[in-house]
A protein has these predicted regions:
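A structural feature recognizing the 12-helix transmembrane core of secondary solute carriers
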Residues: 32-36
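Glycine-rich active-site loops that engage anionic ligands at enzyme catalytic sites
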Residues: 63-104
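A broadly conserved sequence feature marking short terminus-proximal activation segments
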Residues: 1-24, 133-135
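Short cysteine/histidine-rich zinc-coordinating motifs and their immediately flanking basic loops
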Residues: 41-46, 54-62
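Short, cysteine/histidine-rich loop/knuckle motifs that typically chelate Zn2+
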Residues: 28-31, 42-48
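Short functional micro-motifs and their immediate structural scaffolds
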Residues: 37, 51-53
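Well-ordered alpha/beta subsegment
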Residues: 93, 98-136
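Residues immediately within or flanking Cys/His clusters that coordinate Zn2+
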Residues: 23-26, 40
Length: 136
């Protein structure tokens, strides 16, 4: 399945640098002790900008919900239909969610509630992306 190649900006560059090192790095707000993704200029909860720092997290979570895309409108993805689109909740902070196609999991077979772990996939020379796979 073709993947989009990320284009980092000043705000997201630390995240993508960590991904290229096979690490998961998220913003952490010291003011309210919350992780957040995607990166933003200020905390999504308390609006603090001064308290944001990058923190490495364990790449474990679980599938909160999943749908199967059968009739998507993105031309780039049409040949891959049907495919999974899962919402993964991070174990380190259940307020943080990621979306994943769950590589290796056939459509209609995503086990909601199952443990997942982050994995990294090369989409261009020297450019990785993060994905989530069912653990085990």
């Amino acid at each position: 399945m073709p993947k989009l190649i990320p284009v980092a900006d000043a705000l997201s560059q630390p995240f993508w640098d960590a991904v290229n090192q096979r690490r998961l790095l998220l913003q952490h707000c010291a003011a309210c002790d919350r992780l957040q993704y995607p990166p933003q200029q200020a905390c999504q909860v308390c609006n603090s900008a001064n308290g944001l720092a990058w923190k490495e997290v364990d790449g474990r979570g679980h599938i909160a919900t999943c749908i199967v895309i059968e009739d998507g409108r993105l031309n780039r993805r049409m040949p891959d239909q049907p495919y999974n689109l899962a919402m993964v909740t991070l174990d380190a902070d259940p307020r943080v969610n990621f979306y994943s196609n769950l590589p290796g999991t056939p459509p209609y077979q995503a086990p909601v509630g199952a443990a997942v772990e982050v994995t990294f996939e090369e989409v261009a020379p020297n450019q990785l992306i993060h994905e989530w796979r069912v653990a085990g």
